[in-house]
Amino acid sequence: MFDSVTVIGAGRAGSAIAARLRERGVRVGEEGELYLLCVPDRAIPDLAHGIPSGPWVAHVSGATPLTALAPHVRRFSVHPLQTLTMSRGAEQLDGAWAAVTGESPDALAHATALADILGLRPFVLADDRRALYHAGAAMASNFLVTLLRGAARLLADAGAPPEALVPLMERTIANDFELTGPIARGDTATVERHLAAIRSEEPALEPLYTALAEATRP
């Protein structure tokens, strides 16, 4: 549906997306049929205002509403539900889901077409549900880093290698997140020993452990 795309932004998302478009034979350059904003959320409105009317305009933000693309009416968004890095290329997009948002059937068709070109698995997301959706994505991805850092501190304090946590976390994912451990068993005595040890060695982590334990109880 798009033979040419102007990708604005050369960060993690923009670089991976531009590479994939080129792989699929789409011309990436100036005056494209689509202007795709791959920039920080706060920069989207000003950049959108500077784009001439006529072509489609879209962004790849997870939380930003389509009104940020005003005054354009031919607009949509495609948010790859994936964590992206500069050290890898277009293969990061393979098989990832993508939230597509549009205000008309035509806009959704164009958004879905772009997702397909990028190798993504699109699903339709209402514009007014974006913040809630993105909060869930942040919990699953960003807070996983927080959990690993906290767990690594506890292992290091105990004299155990923090890198030993990685296979454990990978297996949890491979096992479809089946809950195991003391909370799953209802072993409150072990949980209390955990809390006592954390309180002694890493008191700043006690509120985090307590909140997670409460949220994890079956």
Q: Residue spans of the language-model regions?
A:
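Hydrophobic beta-strand scaffold residues
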Residues: 25-28, 75, 122
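Internal alpha-helical scaffold of NAD(P)-dependent oxidoreductase catalytic cores
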Residues: 90-174
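Phosphate-coordination loops involved in phosphoryl transfer and adenosine-cofactor binding
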Residues: 2-4, 54, 95
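NAD(P)-dependent Rossmann-like dehydrogenase/reductase catalytic/cofactor-binding core
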Residues: 163-218
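Hydrophobic Val/Ile/Leu positions in short beta-strands of Rossmann-like dinucleotide-binding domains
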Residues: 5-7, 37, 100
